[in-house]
């Protein structure tokens, strides 16, 4: 079985001289090679379309409410199989064209082709050009944004100037009507300092600042009441409520002092002399009186012979 020219071209280790002889020998060989290249090129568009449809089907899977789970599975399976078949066919055609591509690369490297040098018909260079165009568009946009930023900065400066004018001119409003020359001078100064038509943003900002200035502010009333220091209590102990709890030893000393003072005076502190320290002393003194142990003399005077033990319930001892 004789091997045709296309089969001789699409095989490994094909030299450029052999490739040129086969094309010159039969003109239809060049057409067959061109058809193979176009067939592989045309297979790309269906693959892209099927890929887009497959992704859209997966994304809208939940919206397919009129189909059962089995129908959804079969639809996705058929679309995936179709996509796989197209990819395999394109891979096979592209793999068949590899010898021709390698041969043309060797021709560019080894042979001094000059004007006959082989160039790829379509490369990724257009992507770089598009990227450069996008970058130029982005640069123009950023330049426009810079202009807008400059304009906004100018508006901000105008607003600040308007606020300063309002703040400076407000104290003079309550001083009365000025004389004629003074009014003319102020009018002239106002005409020189700003444009006749102020921006709307500046007017709104100035009115807002004037309204805020007219609003009465709440003044903080300082605490003029002096702090009353209790005797025997340091200022550090008054910082926290827990610090007011003194140890048992100090409490005993205060109780003893209060008892001595009350015994010497014979009266309790009056209502006009009530202080936190006196309250603590009185409560401690009352507690001490209630918990005062009985004297041992009272125990010695008890008559144990007259105790009646008949009423005691002794059944629990049995």
UniProtKB/Swiss-Prot annotation:
List compositional bias (Polar residues) regions by residue number: 134-156
GO CC annotations on file: mediator complex
| Top-level division of the source organism's lineage | Eukaryota
- What keywords are assigned to this protein? Activator, Nucleus, Transcription, Transcription regulation
Subcellular location(s): the record lists: Nucleus
Which residues, by range, are in coiled-coil regions? none
**Bias category Low complexity: which stretches?**
192-217
Keyword flag Transcription regulation: yes
> One GO MF term, please?
transcription coregulator activity
GO BP, sorted A to Z: regulation of transcription by RNA polymerase II
Q: Where is this region: Disordered?
A: 134-225
Chief location category: nucleus
Identify the InterPro entries for this entry: Med3
* Function recorded in the entry: Component of the Mediator complex, a coactivator involved in regulated gene transcription of nearly all RNA polymerase II-dependent genes. Mediator functions as a bridge to convey information from gene-specific regulatory proteins to the basal RNA polymerase II transcription machinery. Mediator is recruited to promoters by direct interactions with regulatory proteins and serves as a scaffold for the assembly of a functional preinitiation complex with RNA polymerase II and the general transcription factors.
Assembly mode = Component of the Mediator complex.
Family statement: Belongs to the Mediator complex subunit 3 family.
| Name of protein | Mediator of RNA polymerase II transcription subunit 3
């Amino acid at each position: 079985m004789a091997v045709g020219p296309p089969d001789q071209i699409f095989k490994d280790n094909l030299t450029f001289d052999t490739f040129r002889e086969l094309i010159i020998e039969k003109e239809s060989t060049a057409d067959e090679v061109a058809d193979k290249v176009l067939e592989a090129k045309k297979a790309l568009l269906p693959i892209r379309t099927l890929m887009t449809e497959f992704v859209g089907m997966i994304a809208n899977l939940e919206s397919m409410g009129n189909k059962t789970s089995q129908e959804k599975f079969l639809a996705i399976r058929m679309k995936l199989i179709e996509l796989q078949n197209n990819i395999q066919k394109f891979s096979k055609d592209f793999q068949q064209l590899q010898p021709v591509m390698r041969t043309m690369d060797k021709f560019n490297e080894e042979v001094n082709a000059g004007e006959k040098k082989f160039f790829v018909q379509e490369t990724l260079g257009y992507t770089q050009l598009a990227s450069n165009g996008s970058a130029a568009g982005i640069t123009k946009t950023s330049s426009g944004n810079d202009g807008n930023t400059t304009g906004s900065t100018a508006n901000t400066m105008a607003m600040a100037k308007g606020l300063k004018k309002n703040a400076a001119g407000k104290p003079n409003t309550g001083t009365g009507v000025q004389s004629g020359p003074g009014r003319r001078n102020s009018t002239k100064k106002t005409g020189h300092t700003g444009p006749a038509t102020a921006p709307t943003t500046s007017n709104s900002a100035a009115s807002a600042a004037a309204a805020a200035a007219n609003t009465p502010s709440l003044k903080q009333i300082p605490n003029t009441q002096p702090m009353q220091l209790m005797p025997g209590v340091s200022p550090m102990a008054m910082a926290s409520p827990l610090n007011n709890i003194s140890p048992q030893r100090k409490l005993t000393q205060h109780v003893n002092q209060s008892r001595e003072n009350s015994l010497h005076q014979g009266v309790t502190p009056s209502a006009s002399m009530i202080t936190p320290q006196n309250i603590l002393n009185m409560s401690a003194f009352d507690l001490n009186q209630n918990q005062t142990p009985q004297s041992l003399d009272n125990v010695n005077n008890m008559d144990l012979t007259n105790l009646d033990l008949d009423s005691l319930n002794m059944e629990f001892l049995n």
